Amino acid sequence: MEQTNDIYNRIIYENEAKGQQYRLTVNEFREQMYLHIRKYYLSFDEGYLPTKEGACIPMTIGSVAELFDALVDLLSETE
């Protein structure tokens, strides 16, 4: 398993046939917490590595609350 400096790291989608993962991660940079949703690819020699595809937002109570509300809305629409 690869070593990261992530405070939180969770696979939220995986396609083993294509060697792809999407991960939700949280890390700190210059004393600011960031939340990432990023695509990873399977390297032949180093395990899964991040791509440039994804999004990163400052992790604040407000941004996490908005993300949570959006996910709740999506879930309620699928029922």
Residue ranges and their predicted role:
Residues 53-79:
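Mixed-charge, Lys/Arg-enriched low-complexity segments
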Residues 13-14, 26-31, 59:
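Generic structural "secondary-structure junction" signal
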Residues 1-20:
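Negatively charged, low-complexity tracts enriched in Asp/Glu with abundant Ser/Thr
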Residues 7, 11-12, 37, 57, ...:
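Weak global preference for isoleucine
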Residues 22-53:
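A short, structured beta-strand/loop element
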Residues 5-6, 23, 31, 61, ...:
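Low-complexity, intrinsically disordered regions enriched in charged/polar residues
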